[in-house]
Amino acid sequence: MKSLLFAFLAFATLSAASPKRTFVGVITDDMCAAKAGHATMRMGSTDAECTIACVDAHGAQYVLYDGKTAYSLSDQRTPQQFAGRKVKVTGTLNEKNKTILVTSILAAK
C-alpha cells in the first residue's frame, strides 16, 4: 500500500512540474542574494571568493540570482566552478519553492 501511495505522489509531483527551461543569472549564495549583493558580507576580494566562502564557512547554499529572484539549485556541487559568474541553468522549476531541478549549468556569454 505504501509503495502505491509513493508511486501516486511521485506521479502527481512530476505531472505538476513545469517543463524544462533555461534560466540566466549569476551563481551566488543565498545569504548574499538576500542582500542583493556581496557588499555587506564581502568574504573575499571577488564575488566568486565571497560566494564560495559563504557556502563553505557559513552554511549558505548556491543559488541562481537573475536580478529579481534567487532560485535554489538541486545541484550544490557544480555551481562552485561558476561562482560569481553569469550562467545558463537548464532544468525544471518547482514554482512553489523556487527550486530548479538542475539538468545542466553552462557559462553564459
Question: Which residues does each predicted region cover?
Answer:
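Bacterial Sec-dependent N-terminal signal peptides
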Residues: K2-S3
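Hydrophobic h-region of N-terminal signal peptides that target proteins for export
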Residues: F6-A17
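Conserved RNA-binding domains used in RNP assembly and mRNA/RNA metabolism
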Residues: A16-K109
